[in-house]
Amino acid sequence: MSVSVHENRKSRASSGSINIYLFHKSSYADSVLTHLNLLRQQRLFTDVLLHAGNRTFPCHRAVLAACSRYFEAMFSGGLKESQDSEVNFDNSIHPEVLELLLDYAYSSRVIINEENAESLLEAGDMLEFQDIRDACAEFLEKNLHPTNCLGMLLLSDAHQCTKLYELSWRMCLSNFQTIRKNEDFLQLPQDMVVQLLSSEELETEDERLVYESAINWISYDLKKRYCYLPELLQTVRLALLPAIYLMENVAMEELITKQRKSKEIVEEAIRCKLKILQNDGVVTSLCARPRKTGHALFLLGGQTFMCDKLYLVDQKAKEIIPKADIPSPRKEFSACAIGCKVYITGGRGSENGVSKDVWVYDTLHEEWSKAAPMLVARFGHGSAELKHCLYVVGGHTAATGCLPASPSVSLKQVEHYDPTINKWTMVAPLREGVSNAAVVSAKLKLFAFGGTSVSHDKLPKVQCYDQCENRWTVPATCPQPWRYTAAAVLGNQIFIMGGDTEFSACSAYKFNSETYQWTKVGDVTAKRMSCHAVASGNKLYVVGGYFGIQRCKTLDCYDPTLDVWNSITTVPYSLIPTAFVSTWKHLPS
């Protein structure tokens, strides 16, 4: 057909109306790939040879460059390989693995199994087949097990597979007694073994296992690792070891007695141990701080919204046990734990008067005492522990000239309490006043999520307090405007759940306290407004709350490794939870 014939046809077809037919054959891409693969197998039009091990693979540069940035850069840049007709991988990649990658490039399909997943992930990352790397990571996530999680931790760390790393890490923490016996544990790099043994979420109730694991890791390559002994000893909660074991086994260990710094660390732990046994003042040293599995969970509640009792939550027996009456029943207070003590701040009493009182419950001696009152009476506020001190954030106070029950606008004021001197001081105020916000501490900072603003709206902001700079910033916004939510911390992740809307009441998110990024996690088992949450070990626990006229009757547990919520036990119908805290528990020894 000549050009003139086509032009004549165009002029005849110009009737002024638009008549278009878009033809699309959905199977076209697959048929092209199939034919390209056939051409490859017949070595037709191939223009490059890939060598791996003792095998050679003829390929088309254009196909490789289209599915791999590695090959695109190699063939289009000024590298020597851009002119060469051969690329030699030698033994850096197994020929069977390269064959699988090439089959995927020419077919968009690959079979991933337990035998090839790790090698495919490594090769996919090396040659920048990102889809393959991600698919292998997803496969390995679904096949995580206590026997392989250490290997997956190392693999995901080397290849920046974030989700696989996080899940592997959580499984390592949850299965410490299994992984410590694994050969992979002894081969962990120094920074990773320190991070693991020092973690608050490491699940062990016997610090002897942590100590023995540290010594075993050092002894595995004593010549190179002996210098790390002081750092590893500091990961062990030495003052929580049985006294006889600490003084006869640890203090007499030859590796320790021969190293001055290590000897000093153990001597300090012995001093802390004696203070604990003799009840001689507050012990705040890290060596005496229980991990979260060594924490006790306490629930505060009553038969009405007026809270009058403190309960112990027995996680093993799945029971809620009454422990003590609260000296001054109240509602809309905040509760926070520091060490072995529970601090109850503010709230409203039976006469609806707003309180600045602070009551302290010592869980070891099972007795109440009164601390110095806050500077501002408040209710509907949040509280959190940071560096062994207590912070109260926002809330309401009684409005001047109004009935005691009439609230002021949401407060900006933030107070700091030092239990060693029993004194309150004001610190930098919030950027925006809030009440009913979720307040927690993570990575040496305070965070306030959402809440009711000064204008009585739901605030969609994350406010963050830096103690060193004594100032608040707004580093992020919430996925939705929030109030009446609960928050708890696992590592650098802050989990937020519940709320006062149909959607937020059943939703849960996690917030990275370092990158300020949000991720949606599995929904809670029931809609919850004004629920309460704590972390214990490597899990989250949520209790209380209501939605409409429906009260939530279960204590639920979230496993971040599985992204699953389960109901642990039923809360007595006569008990309305008002607060939920996690304290240290020093086991007698």
UniProtKB/Swiss-Prot annotation:
Residues 46-114 form the BTB domain. GO terms for cellular component: chromatin; Cul3-RING ubiquitin ligase complex; cytoplasm; cytoskeleton; neuronal cell body; nuclear matrix; nucleoplasm; nucleus. The gene is ENC1. This is Ectoderm-neural cortex protein 1. Coiled coil: none annotated. GO terms for molecular function: actin binding. Keywords: Actin-binding, Cytoplasm, Cytoskeleton, Developmental protein, Kelch repeat, Nucleus, Repeat, Ubl conjugation. Its main location: nucleus. PROSITE patterns: BTB (PS50097). Ubiquitinated by E3 ubiquitin ligase complex formed by CUL3 and RBX1 and probably targeted for proteasome-independent degradation. Quinone-induced oxidative stress increases its ubiquitination. Binds to RB1. Hypophosphorylated RB1 associates with ENC1 during neuronal differentiation, while hyperphosphorylated RB1 associates with ENC1 in undifferentiating cells. Part of a complex that contains CUL3, RBX1 and ENC1. Interacts indirectly with KEAP1. Kelch repeats lie at residues 296-340, 341-388, 389-444, 446-492, 494-538, 539-585. It is found in: Nucleus matrix; Cytoplasm; Cytoplasm, Cytoskeleton. GO terms for biological process: negative regulation of translation; nervous system development; positive regulation of neuron projection development; proteasomal ubiquitin-independent protein catabolic process; protein ubiquitination. SMART domains: BACK, BTB, Kelch. Pfam families: BACK, BTB, Kelch_1, Kelch_KLHDC2_KLHL20_DRC7. Actin-binding protein involved in the regulation of neuronal process formation and in differentiation of neural crest cells. Down-regulates transcription factor NF2L2/NRF2 by decreasing the rate of protein synthesis and not via a ubiquitin-mediated proteasomal degradation mechanism. The keyword Nucleotidyltransferase does not apply. The keyword ATP-binding does not apply. Detected in fetal brain tissue, moderate expression in fetal heart, lung and kidney. Highly expressed in adult brain, particularly high in the hippocampus and amygdala, and spinal cord. Detectable in adult pancreas. May be down-regulated in neuroblastoma tumors. PANTHER family: ECTODERM-NEURAL CORTEX PROTEIN 1 (PTHR24412:SF496), KELCH PROTEIN (PTHR24412). Induction: By p53/TP53.
